[in-house]
């Protein structure tokens, strides 16, 4: 049963913020501009691997994860148009998916709520039950795969398939499982004409899986013959890169909003704008002096 956070209206947002006494990533005066902006229905924003701890002062690998998320939110709020949706691709919590982690995460994304609806995926540092209890007020539950957070949503130029690769909390590899793969195959059969983009936390890994998606081969057995599948978007590695599978499916490895494992690699967020025959993708690095910051790449869809 996936969770989806609908966009808050101005009245809902201001009322909720006042009642909660929430600390916001933006000054109150900034919100007037947000509510007045137009929406680009073809643009989507991706955050990944936020790793928010209960203690907002927590630091790991010299990075304050809460501060990094706040910086991403501020830049998103300053963007000239509002995206169609914001997708946060797993590892929302720091290590063990504790209730306090999600409480701090919820505060961190509060300023996103009036900007766009949000889809939240899970990674290996999340804990499903704690996560599901963290947003009781306004989550929309959709039936899909029992005990998995999988969903399909449609936009003008693509259908989006959101998967749940959380296997065991704080164990590095992930797994979709036969039930979820079967569900995905059936949903792809039901959505044959529009381009399909699949989003999952764990990275596909070849030929031997040690830290990524344990059923990578089984996933590609589903994706490759469904020619409407054009891209697989994932996180987990904390290493921004774009490659292409032999089948023609684009592999997009999101940067973390938090920390990187390799020196010199960017952290930040990604803007995706869909075209009829592909996508434009831009890295927004938190380090504006990073050589890849602001780079825009054009991806063309495979045939079929």
Residue ranges of model-derived segments:
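Extended active-site neighborhood of metal-dependent phosphoesterases/phosphodiesterases
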Residues: 35-36, 98-186, 190-191, 195, ...
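Surface-exposed cleft-lining segments at the edges of enzyme active sites
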Residues: 92-93, 166-175, 204-208
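N-terminal secretory signal peptides
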Residues: 1-12
